[in-house]
Amino acid sequence: MAMKSVSNFAIFLILFLVTSEISEIEAKDKECLKGYIDAPLSYCMARIYPSLCYRNCRFYKGAKGGKCDGLKCFCDFCSDKPF
């Protein structure tokens, strides 16, 4: 009986630690990525490297980079990786 309660405690502890780390990662992404509101669709439609989203976020918004999610452009203020 004692072994079962220790196992249950260990499982709940692991789940708690995993969920707290995931929320911390999501919060960091929200701080880093800001939507480029006035970006035309062509910023993410053109298949060039690095994308127009990446280039214009760096030039006009002062970001380190930019990423496309579908046809939406997001300026990345934490990372300069073009993907």
Curated annotation (Swiss-Prot):
Transmembrane annotation, as ranges: none
InterPro entries attached to this UniProt entry: Scorpion_toxin-like, Scorpion_toxin-like_sf, Scorpion_toxinL/defensin
Listed result of changing I11T: In strain: cv. Cvi-1 and cv. Nd-1
Gene3D superfamilies: Knottin, scorpion toxin-like
Cysteines engaged in disulfide bonds, as pairs: C32-C78, C44-C68, C53-C73, C57-C75
GO cellular component, one term: extracellular region
Signal peptide positions (record): 1-27
Highest taxon of the lineage: Eukaryota
UniProt cross-references to Pfam families, sorted A to Z: Toxin_3
Keyword Disulfide bond in annotation: yes
Localization per record: Secreted
Gene Ontology biological-process entries: defense response to fungus; killing of cells of another organism
A GO molecular-function descriptor: sodium channel inhibitor activity
UniProt keywords, alphabetically: Antimicrobial, Disulfide bond, Fungicide, Plant defense, Secreted, Signal
Homology family: Belongs to the DEFL family. Protease inhibitor I18 (RTI/MTI-2) subfamily.
Protein name according to UniProt: Defensin-like protein 194
Native source species: Arabidopsis thaliana
